[in-house]
Amino acid sequence: MPSSGDAAGRRPHVVLIPSAGMGHLVPFGRLAVALSSGHGCDVSLVTVLPTVSTAESKHLDALFDAFPAVRRLDFELAPFDASEFPSADPFFLRFEAMRRSAPLLGPLLTGAGASALATDIALTSVVIPVAKEQGLPCHILFTASAAMLSLCAYFPTYLDANAGDGGGVGDVDIPGVYRIPKASIPQALHDPNHLFTRQFVANGRSLTSAAGILVNTFDALEPEAVAALQQGKVASGFPPVFAVGPLLPASNQAKDPQANYMEWLDAQPARSVVYVSFGSRKAISGEQLRELAAGLETSGHRFLWVVKSTVVDRDDAAELGELLGEGFLKRVEKRGLVTKAWVDQEEVLKHESVALFVSHCGWNSVTEAAASGVPVLALPRFGDQRVNSGVVARAGLGVWADTWSWEGEAGVIGAEEISEKVKAAMADEALRRKAASLAKAAAKAVAGGGSSHRCLVEFARLCQGGTCRTN
């Protein structure tokens, strides 16, 4: 429990409790480094064991090796029978296993001597009660967009108001923000009995009990959503909201000595390369991969493409030639590099040769594109990615054809459509200028005295006080 000495000059000890998935884990690592290196906090990062993927294990090992000031707190999950949810996504299962193990966190927190907690949105409703038992303030790090945070905060109210009408989930008009169309609502939320829906609603209802909410965004990227959340327009009794993004990648983590993609980029002309990546979690169907390959080929542009053909860590034995169509790699070898290996995305986006990012619009990818000033061609596949694509289009960071299909919908996006969108985006100087202006705004936000920097300073100050919000 926090003592009076915490408020009298001792460094606050902030314990961060992330959930599963690189999209959740990466921003927690970045927050840990920021707080420990620039904001006078002692920081511990809870590592949940076993991890859900080898990518998570490697990321955590690299983080702790590079930043020994961030302390590691291992937390073993209680046994969990996943057969209760036979067809659930591996990450939704991990969220549930972590939620059921949360009551066991108490002894770990007591031994750590924490003065404040920050946990993931996926664990909100189960970690806040544990924090209250310990007399600790519990903040939330929301790892997606402010638009998605506003949906999470308002969705329980929306469901309550529409209960019994039998019409299912439709367009959601979020007070102070804007309308999120039915087609952009994450697929799982259309099923009231889905495991993720139950988790999402429980966590949304619990947000008003948090001490504060940090969100990885900045004012210029999401002005409406940030303002509405901070002004309490989305939900009554909402805690303080701190827009602390873009949370920047740690700068001294080890690079892969075997990687050759940077050498390839170095050999390309300035602003000539299309970078293509769809994140670490989901695979794209074979048919869609081949259409994308054909679209990139007929666009005529250079490209670096990171191909993922499996879900999580399932065996990935397929050869690239088999995945992308006969003869494709040979035909594009002089202007395209295709790899199944991990790349340092932030390093790629900062490279002067990269002119466009064809992305699924996972939120980390969006913030990294904004910080780098690289325009985005949005190709969302599932979850919050259509909401994020809407943010990209509204901010002028990129373009999104909102009629394109995504996971669970019939049809694929054709090669000709992809080719035309790539060519148009590569030729759009106004789009390039807007992306560059957002990069300047992002840099200003995180610099000393900027809006995001001030929010982190205020968060650290609150952690120093060690007070517990009890509403």
UniProtKB/Swiss-Prot annotation:
UDP-alpha-D-glucose binds at residues 143, 343, 345, 360, 363-365, 368, 384-385. UDP-glucose-dependent glucosyltransferase catalyzing the c-glucosylation of 2-hydroxyflavanones. InterPro entries: UDP-glycosyltransf_plant, UDP_glucos_trans, UDP_glycos_trans_CS. Its EC number is 2.4.1.360. Belongs to the UDP-glycosyltransferase family. GO terms for molecular function: 2-hydroxyflavanone C-glucosyltransferase activity; UDP-glucosyltransferase activity. This is UDP-glycosyltransferase CGT.
